[in-house]
Amino acid sequence: MDLTLTRSGTVKDPINLVSDGHITVHQLHVLADHVIIQGFTVVGGGELLLAGTGIVAQKNTVHDTQRGGIICASCTDSIIESNTVTHAATTGISISGQRITVRENLVSETVAGGDGDADGVRFFGNGLRIISNSIQDISVKGSPAALHPDCFQTFDTGHSATFDVDIIGNACRNVAENCLIATGDESGNSEAPAGVRSITFIGNDCVTDGDQAVNLRRWPNVDVRKNHLLGPNLKRAVLITNGSTHSTVRDNITRSDVAAVKIDDSSRPGFNSPF
C-alpha cells in the first residue's frame, strides 16, 4: 500500500497521521504543511518523503527501501525525531531546507543506491540541527571504488548554500569512510553569507574506517571541536584542503600516532588551531 497526504493542517490544529505501530506501507509521502506522522512502518519500496512547513516525523520505522529512508525535501521548521532507518538505499536521512531538526534517530546499514553511494545523513540548507543521532554499520560493499560511505555528508553540486548547521553529540560507528565530509566542488559553497559559520561539529563520537574522520574540501568556515575522532585506518583526524579557509580545529581526541590535522597552504588563511 502506498499512502500520500496532500491536505495541510494549521499551526494550532495540525493533522495527526498516527499508526498504532502495526500499519505497514510500501511508501509514505506527505506533501503538506503542519502534519505529524507517527508510528508507521515503511518497508520494501519508496521512502518516507516529506515536503512542507511544520512537519514532524517521529517514532517511525523505515527499512529495505529503494529510494532512501526519510527524505525531507524543501522543508521548513520541521522535525525528524526518534525514527529507526535500516538498510535504506543511498541515504538513511536526507534534509534540505530551513530550520530542520534531526534528533535521536538510529540509522544503520545504508546500502549503495542510484548514485552508488551510501550515507547516514545528508544535509543541505540553513538553520539545520543534527543532534544525538546514532549512525552505524555502513560498509563499502556494493559502492563503486571512487565513492565513499559517510556518516554526515553535504556538497554544493546542484544545491544552494549550506550554512548555520550544528552537528552535535552524535555517534558514528563502523562506517567505511568519513564521519563528516563537506565538499564545495561546484562553487566552494560561495552563496553562503560571508563570515557566517557553515558547520559547527562538536562533541561527536566517531569511529570510522577511512583515512580521516573529517574531510573538508573547498568548504570554508567549519568549526571542529571536542570530538572523539578514532578509527583503525586513520592517517590524520581532520583533512582540510582546496581553500577551506577560516576553519577551527581544537580539543579533539584521536590516537597518539595520528596527526590531529592536515591542512594545505590554500586553506591556512583564518585557520584557528593549536597545531
Question: What are these model-derived regions, one by one?
Answer:
Residues 225, 235-275:
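Acidic, glycine- and Ser/Thr-rich low-complexity intrinsically disordered tracts
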